[in-house]
Amino acid sequence: MKDKFELVSKYSPQGDQPRAIEQLVAGLKKGLKHQTLLGATGTGKTFTVSNVIQEVNKPTLVMAHNKTLAGQLYSEFKEFFPNNAVEYFVSYYDYYQPEAYVPQSDTYIEKDASINDEIDKLRHSATAALFERRDVIIIASVSCIYGLGSPIEYGEMLVSLRVGMEISRDQLLRKLVDIQYDRNDIDFQRGRFRVRGDVVEIFPASRDEHCMRIEFFGDEIERIREVDALTGEIIGEREHVSIFPASHFVTRPDIMKKAIVNIKAELEDRLQVLRADNKLLEAQRLEQRTNYDLEMMEEMGYCSGIENYSRHLSLRPAGVTPYTLLDYFPDDFQMVIDESHVTMPQIRGMFNGDQARKQMLVDHGFRLPSALDNRPLRLEEFEKHINQIMFISATPGPYELEKNPDVIEQIIRPTGLLDPIVEIRPIQGQIDDLMDEINNRVEKNERVLITTLTKKMSEDLTNYLKEAGVKVQYLHSEVKTLERIEIIRDLRLGVYDVIVGINLLREGIDLPEVSLVAILDADKEGFLRSERSLIQTMGRAARNENGRVIMYADKMTDSMRNSIGETERRRKIQIEYNEKHGITPKTIKKEIRGIIAATSAADEREAVKQHDLSKMSKKERDVFIEGMEHEMKEAAKALDFERAAELRDALLEIKAEG
């Protein structure tokens, strides 16, 4: 079993990275449960964490607050650890519209999803790696706290094969069917097997290129070979191979029988309650739907939405903590929470959001109460899984600071870039003053971000600047994801010089061309003008050597004082380090596509605006459909189920028309 992490990099730790690494490692070796790394933007936090992982040498779970960030971290860790198992575990849905009921309009929306096969493969690869080795880093989104099948069943049902092992060909085939592999001699792909005489070829669920060829002599395995599934080329000989289940929700036939008995008993109890409350329509609906699911489970071994019966399938009592990816790790694993000021509130809030939606389905007879146990972890359940944890953030939140107030700092950027200079100017005459600043920046081919507090002020300011001849765009919450990507990209390209918005903290706004961030109404205390938000907003100017922040305010609030004090403190440390080491700050040069996940749809922006499908070319039509699919996913993410369902139906119509 491979168990040593090996960090590969042409860089060595610089600035205050060595001290941060040393402190984090010492804390972990001392047995500290919670540690926080306060790392300013662009200081190389991932490299620091990689050094810690190598030094401590334990299986590691790195959690991020969305798929995009998880993808970036996966690429970075893969580069740092090419000889170890760096795995990726995020939701495998490209699009996920959860089952929902809207009582106001009596609208039931069925679950609808499209599964990404590549991500499904990576999820299987991640769980398999945890059973086979210790040098494992799994990069996961918060979806890793959602219910997953039992790791005990998963481990016990794996099929272990060795050369010389006595097992008949037919016994092996039965075992493969039990772990949800399909026989298909023609269309051979992941999660399938094929048979040719005394040779069985198995395509593991965690692979997409190589399969295993098992050769029998009578009732004995004579040879095991790894084969290229496409070309048939022999990759190598194997003495032993483990075939993991093709689904994380594997259920043995004997357990399925018990589960069906328990589901029927729960259904009877629930029907009595509904009828006693005179909810006859709900009772009829529940009886019809559940009996249909039970028939499918008896005949086929599964049904649509089988995860809603997961508590019965694992024979757990009501309310018990569900199994998740965290249960697949060994007891001594360590956790890293990236952007913890965002990720921890997300972990805290996931249970409540999930329960509110499911409770509606239970109340109106769409689901049995046991569906409530197919859920994400509560915060206190998540905490019980923690062995040792490191929080990483430029602005740690109250949760992290409460767990361990002794924060480890990483302030120096390897590029020498400083935190921006912050100025406070009076509100009176702020627009004229802002115009002068914008003109100065435009002359130098630099960009400006302006943040306001209200939608009306953003709109009025944008219109005023447009009339004054400024190339400006307003970025508000109603701007769709694709459009947002285009606007940010166009700011970098110089189509716009200024972006006005309310919340400019969202991902994708770290732009090297931005040398000025203007904060209007900086003295109005609240979420968008809190100390943490102000530090994050000011950080948007930290990628440019001429970075500057102007706060327009008539009084100094505690949030302003603290955020300015923190920025000046960091700046002083950075200047001293640069002077001591002869470093001159230089603006980061980034490829336009490097910072933003630009898509083909963003390249075809004009085509998307054409709504007459009959006049579109195939390429334009494909782009239009892609744009609609993005909008549908965003609507589902925002819990706007009705809008997502409308878009889904419209897409089906368009696709049906050919």
Swiss-Prot record:
Domain UVR: start-end pairs: 622-658
Pfam families: Helicase_C, ResIII, UVR, UvrB, UvrB_inter
GO cellular component, one term: cytoplasm
Gene Ontology MF annotations: ATP binding; ATP hydrolysis activity; DNA binding; excinuclease ABC activity
Top-level taxonomic group: Bacteria
Start and end residues of each Helicase C-terminal domain: 430-592
Bilayer-crossing regions: none
Subcellular location: Cytoplasm
Chain location of the short sequence motif Beta-hairpin per the record: 92-115
Keyword entries, A-Z: ATP-binding, Cytoplasm, DNA damage, DNA excision, DNA repair, Excision nuclease, Nucleotide-binding, SOS response
Keyword flag DNA repair: yes
InterPro entries according to UniProt: Helicase/UvrB_N, Helicase_ATP-bd, Helicase_C-like, P-loop_NTPase, UVR_dom, UVR_dom_sf, UvrB, UvrB_inter
Keyword Cell inner membrane annotated: no
Helicase ATP-binding domain mapped to chain residues: 26-414
Chief localisation class: cytoplasm
Gene Ontology BP terms: nucleotide-excision repair; SOS response
Residues that coordinate or bind ATP: G39, A40, T41, G42, T43, G44, K45, T46
Family: Belongs to the UvrB family.
Function description: The UvrABC repair system catalyzes the recognition and processing of DNA lesions. A damage recognition complex composed of 2 UvrA and 2 UvrB subunits scans DNA for abnormalities. Upon binding of the UvrA(2)B(2) complex to a putative damaged site, the DNA wraps around one UvrB monomer. DNA wrap is dependent on ATP binding by UvrB and probably causes local melting of the DNA helix, facilitating insertion of UvrB beta-hairpin between the DNA strands. Then UvrB probes one DNA strand for the presence of a lesion.
Domain notes: The beta-hairpin motif is involved in DNA binding.
Entry-linked HAMAP family: UvrB
Oligomeric form and interacting partners: Forms a heterotetramer with UvrA during the search for lesions. Interacts with UvrC in an incision complex.
Protein name per Swiss-Prot or TrEMBL: UvrABC system protein B
Source organism: Listeria monocytogenes serotype 4b (strain F2365)
Gene designation: uvrB
